[in-house]
Curated annotation (Swiss-Prot):
Presequence extent in this chain: 1-35
Stated family: Belongs to the aspartate/ornithine carbamoyltransferase superfamily. OTCase family.
Binding site for carbamoyl phosphate: 91-95, 142, 169, 331
One record GO biological process: arginine biosynthetic process via ornithine
Organism in which the protein naturally occurs: Ovis aries (Sheep)
Binding-site positions, L-ornithine: 142, 200, 264-268, 303-306, 331
Signal sequence coordinates: none
Localisation: Mitochondrion matrix
Gene from which the chain derives: OTC
Protein name as annotated: Ornithine transcarbamylase, mitochondrial
N6-acetyllysine found at: 71, 89, 145, 222, 232, 239, 244, 293, 308
Regulation: Negatively regulated by lysine acetylation.
Keywords: Acetylation, Amino-acid biosynthesis, Arginine biosynthesis, Mitochondrion, Phosphoprotein, Transferase, Transit peptide, Urea cycle
Residues bearing PTM Phosphoserine: 134
């Protein structure tokens, strides 16, 4: 107890001697009042989280980024913990951000590909979940089918995190929102303009944007609209939160007045055989300065990467309005926050950002 109190006093004294720090009283291992409790939960889709719970993960992301990147602190919050990483699909940002982030916090990530493990093939999903539960503290799985994640979560006794599935990509959206909060200072009232495929990224935005008070304007080619059941739920969220949701097949209509222009790959992993058909269907959906002309004066651009020139031209992608590289970096801070929130009792020290 004496050591903890002394450490607290030294931490507070050091912070008071800083210049631009805004902090709350902080005591290691002691939750702040009214702290959101996420420990032990799964993160399969943002549909399962309230606006306050998502905001808490973003707050924790900002806190870790500030303490580690700006202040240079070492925070071994995951020391002694291990993470199983199951990847059925290739990855750059998801793998790098998770491996480096988990290790930076003192934990041990273990990467498994389809050469190492075959979900439901060489071993049942039930057996895999139980074995992983006995050897790791959490699992991040990047899979083809959301249903596989659901089974893993049902059978495992440890948190399961969706690293991407056919329906959702929640950890990408956390990085997007952190990036927008850093740029605009707040998320409430922003209009997001989605121009592209009705895919897992869009689904995750639809399950969360209204909870922040953000409006969403979606343009997809005919036949490539978002999942109808997800659209129905998104309409309910918009009604509950007093936000607007519109769907169209006209890219300029969706871009009109938008603060944030967002697109993604037109051809996701597993859709390579549809390439010719999709390229034809998405003609006219490239984000260009012509698209930006009808957007809000303060427009910015997001793309989760990797990017192809037919999706967005160089003029927009490499412009000062493009936030794609800060967005990519924030994948690391947000996945770190997810792991800390699901595996520890740590409370943010930084003042809560405005959302």
């Amino acid at each position: 107890m004496l050591f903890i109190n002394l450490r607290t006093l030294l931490n507070n004294a050091a912070l008071r001697n800083g210049h631009n720090f805004v902090v709350r009283n902080f005591r290691c291992g002691q939750p702040v009042q009214d702290k959101v409790q996420l420990k032990g939960r799964d993160l399969l889709t943002l549909k399962n989280f309230t606006g306050e719970e998502i905001k808490y993960m973003l707050w924790l992301s900002a806190d870790l980024k500030f303490r580690i990147k700006q202040k240079g602190e070492y925070l071994p919050l995951l020391q002694g913990k291990s993470l199983g990483m199951i990847f059925e699909k290739r990855s750059t940002r998801t793998r790098l951000s998770t491996e480096t982030g988990f290790a930076l916090l003192g934990g041990h990530p273990c990467f498994l590909t389809t050469d190492d493990i075959h979900l439901g093939v060489n071993e049942s999903l039930t057996d895999t979940a139980r074995v992983l539960s006995s050897m790791t503290d959490a699992v991040l799985a990047r899979v083809y089918k959301q249903s596989d994640l659901d089974i893993l979560a049902k059978e495992a006794s440890i948190p399961i995190v969706n690293g991407l599935s056919d329906l959702y990509h929640p950890i990408q959206i956390l990085a997007d929102y952190l990036t927008l909060q850093e740029h605009y200072g707040s998320l409430k009232g922003l209009t997001l303009s989605w121009i592209g495929d009705g895919n897992n990224i869009l689904h995750s935005i639809m399950m969360s944007a209204a909870k922040f008070g953000m409006h969403l304007q979606v343009a997809t080619p005919k036949g490539y609209e978002p999942d109808p059941s997800i659209t129905k739920l998104a309409e309910q969220y918009a009604k509950e939160n007093g936000t607007k949701l519109s769907l169209t097949n006209d890219p300029l209509e969706a871009a009109c007045g938008g603060n944030v222009l967002i697109t993604d790959t037109w051809i996701s992993m597993g859709q390579e055989e549809e390439k010719k058909k999709r390229l034809q269907a998405f003609q006219g959906y490239q984000v260009t300065m012509k698209t930006a002309k009808v957007a809000a004066p303060d427009w910015t651009f997001l793309h989760c990467l990797p990017r192809k020139p037919e999706e967005v031209d160089d003029e927009v992608f490499y412009s000062p309005r493009s936030l794609v590289f800060p967005e990519a970096e924030n994948r690391k801070w947000t996945i770190m926050a997810v792991m800390v929130s699901l595996l520890t009792d740590y409370s943010p020290q930084l003042q809560k950002p405005k959302f």
